[in-house]
C-alpha cells in the first residue's frame, strides 16, 4: 500500500503587511508588479499609501510618528562620556579598581547603543524596496526584522553582564569568593563575575547595608530583564529563537517509540522558543529603560569623582584613602 501526502505551506507573515493605494489593497509583491517600472519608484509612492499591518491601518505619516515615538523611548546613556572619562588619568593612579570598573562602564554603554540600533531596525515594519526588493513579498523584510530583534536581545543580555562587571571590579567583590586566588590573571577573575556568584556574595554580606543598596540596584535590573535573559539563553545555548509567522507550520510530526507506546523522540522537541516579534518589542523597550536607570544608579553609587586626588603647592600628591569613599570594602 502506498501513501502520498501533499502539503502546501506558506508562512503567515506573507499576509502581515498590505499597502492601500488609490482605493486598492496590495501585498508587497503585488504592489511591486503593478507599479514598479524604474528604481526608487515604489519609495516615491509610499507616502501616498496607507499601511495595513496585522489588521491595523495607519497612514504613512502615522507610521513615521510611531517610529519617532520608539526612538524617544530609547534614551542614550552617556554616564561614561559625561562624568567618568575625564577622570581616567587620575583613576589609574588613585584607584586602579575604579579605573577597571570605568572601562566596563564604557563597554556597557557601547553595548547598549548597539542594542538600541538593532531594536529600532527590528521595530521598523517596512523596508525600502531599494534595500529589500518588494517583488519577493514581505517574508524577506520580516526575516530581516527577526534577525535584528534577536541581535538586540543578545546585546541587551550582554549589557547586564557588563553591569555586573562594573560593580564586581569597583569593589573587588571577587575577593569574597572561595574560588579566588591572589595570583589569578585578570581574565580568570572576570570569569568569576556571574549573577550566581553575586547571589552568594549577597548572602555572605547580608548585614552590609551598602551592599544591600548595590544589590537592589542590580536586582531591579535583573528582574526587568528576566524575559530578555531567557530569550538570550535560548539564542546562545539552546534551540535558538523562532518567530511566529516566519516559517509555515510543519504539517507533520514524527513520533518514534517502543511497541508499548512509549515515545522516544519527536520532531517538536527540537523546536526553538517561539516569540511574537511585535509583542517582544515593548519588552525590549522596557529593558532598555531599565538598563539606563541601572547604569545611572550604579554610577551614582560608586561615586568615581571621590577617587580624584589633588597636588599641593610642593608638587606632592594627596591621594584619598580608599576607606574614606569606597562604600563596599574588599575582603582581605
Feature-to-residue mapping (PLM):
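Acidic, Ser/Thr/Gly/Pro-rich intrinsically disordered interaction regions
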Residues: 2-110, 114, 137-147, 165-332
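Hydrophobic, aromatic-enriched interface-forming segments
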Residues: 154-169
